[in-house]
UniProtKB/Swiss-Prot annotation:
<dbReference type="Pfam" id="PF00334">
    <property type="entry name" value="NDK"/>
</dbReference>
<feature type="binding site">
    <location>
        <position position="95"/>
    </location>
    <ligand>
        <name>ATP</name>
    </ligand>
</feature>
<keyword id="KW-0472">Membrane</keyword>
<comment type="function">
    <text>Major role in the synthesis of nucleoside triphosphates other than ATP. The ATP gamma phosphate is transferred to the NDP beta phosphate via a ping-pong mechanism, using a phosphorylated active-site intermediate.</text>
</comment>
<dbReference type="GO" id="GO:0006241">
    <property type="term" value="P:CTP biosynthetic process"/>
</dbReference>
<keyword id="KW-0547">Nucleotide-binding</keyword>
<keyword id="KW-0460">Magnesium</keyword>
<dbReference type="GO" id="GO:0006183">
    <property type="term" value="P:GTP biosynthetic process"/>
</dbReference>
<dbReference type="InterPro" id="IPR034907">
    <property type="entry name" value="NDK-like_dom"/>
</dbReference>
<keyword id="KW-0546">Nucleotide metabolism</keyword>
<keyword id="KW-0808">Transferase</keyword>
<keyword id="KW-0597">Phosphoprotein</keyword>
<dbReference type="GO" id="GO:0005737">
    <property type="term" value="C:cytoplasm"/>
</dbReference>
<dbReference type="InterPro" id="IPR023005">
    <property type="entry name" value="Nucleoside_diP_kinase_AS"/>
</dbReference>
<keyword id="KW-0963">Cytoplasm</keyword>
<dbReference type="GO" id="GO:0005886">
    <property type="term" value="C:plasma membrane"/>
</dbReference>
<feature type="active site" description="Pros-phosphohistidine intermediate">
    <location>
        <position position="119"/>
    </location>
</feature>
Length: 153
């Protein structure tokens, strides 16, 4: 995969969906120049969420996190572009919204860490694992955007 074809998994959590922030979040990723290659609106099962957050299973907040993520619909997405994992994390802001800068998604729209509206893969390896967990290969659309040559050299 070429450098500008790196992929990341981004999920708008139930609070982000309920607060009507889906369009604003998608807009920010599109305006940055990233390409949406997969998206689904789902009510994730407890089993899927436990698998997604398996690395956190021994943390005291884990049961509450799974319950919160299972409390409503999620918009699961795969975005593609140059350094999309790292840049996507910068766009999201810190996990704790109180530490997030204005202009980031969490800095602009969140107050508490337990309701931080969005998840983003923290590494290329995590992104691949999360994408494979949430999407079948046929659900990811491979295409070249007309804007590609206006974004990349």
């Amino acid at each position: 995969m070429a450098a500008n074809c790196e992929r990341t998994f981004i999920a708008i959590k139930p609070d982000g969906v309920q607060r009507g922030l889906v369009g604003e979040i998608i807009k920010r990723f599109e305006q940055k120049g990233f390409r949406l290659v997969g998206m689904k609106f789902v009510h994730a099962s407890e089993e899927l969420l436990k698998q997604h957050y398996i690395d956190l299973k021994d943390r005291p907040f884990y049961p509450g996190l799974v319950k919160y993520m299972n409390s409503g619909p999620i918009v699961a997405m795969v975005w593609e572009g140059l350094n999309v994992v790292k840049t996507g994390r910068v766009m999201l802001g810190e996990t704790n919204p109180a530490d997030s800068k204005p202009g980031t998604i969490r800095g602009d729209f969140c107050i508490q860490v337990g309701r931080n509206i969005i998840h983003g893969s923290d590494s290329v390896e995590s992104a691949q694992k999360e994408i494979n967990l949430w999407f079948k290969p046929a659900e990811l659309i491979d295409f070249k955007s007309c804007a590609h040559d206006w974004i990349y050299e």
